[in-house]
């Protein structure tokens, strides 16, 4: 939510690639968050990300998940953060507001480390998922391949080279 949205999207993208069944709570109002979380229970985990000025919507989502016995993980700046009220695991990273823009460098580094650690815990699953993704990307041409040659190489010849070739 708010300035933490890019961090949450990055984390959700990679967690979904590793495990699947990962959802991003994204909303402009609190009621929509509860609608998205209505099925959360003790088998689920919620990762709340918030830095000063702490988001009340994130805090309320964490409270709701906690009331339903879901596991709560927090990514925040200090143990004194209100985000730590409901979490059993606090991952701390500084987020200094040097100017009008929050610095997300440390939190993003923490998220990178978390993703790598989770990959190391389930290497076979990750390898299988990445191989399946790679196959899908190849089959449906998601990314350009080097073997495609969109440039007609004859057009790269200089006018002088063309003249020489015509004289021969």
State the predicted function of each range.
Residues 1-109, 113-122:
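Glycine-rich phosphate-binding loops that contact phosphosugars or nucleotide phosphates
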Residues 122-160, 167:
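Internal, active-site/partner-interface "lid" segment
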């Amino acid at each position: 939510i708010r300035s933490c949205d890019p961090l949450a999207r990055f984390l959700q993208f990679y967690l979904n690639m590793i495990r699947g069944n990962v959802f991003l709570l994204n909303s402009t109002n609190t009621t929509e968050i509860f609608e998205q979380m209505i099925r959360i229970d003790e088998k689920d985990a919620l990762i709340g990300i918030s830095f000063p000025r702490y988001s009340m919507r994130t805090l309320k989502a964490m409270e709701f998940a906690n009331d339903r016995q879901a596991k709560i993980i927090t990514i925040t700046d200090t143990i004194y953060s209100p985000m730590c009220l409901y979490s059993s695991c606090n991952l701390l990273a500084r987020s200094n507001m040097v100017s009008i823009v929050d610095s997300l460098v440390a939190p993003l580094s923490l998220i990178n480390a978390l993703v790598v650690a989770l990959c190391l815990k389930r290497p076979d699953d990750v390898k299988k998922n990445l191989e399946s993704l790679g196959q899908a990307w190849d089959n449906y041409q998601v990314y350009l391949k080097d073997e495609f040659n969109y440039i007609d190489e004859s057009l790269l010849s200089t006018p002088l080279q063309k003249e020489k070739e015509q004289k021969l």
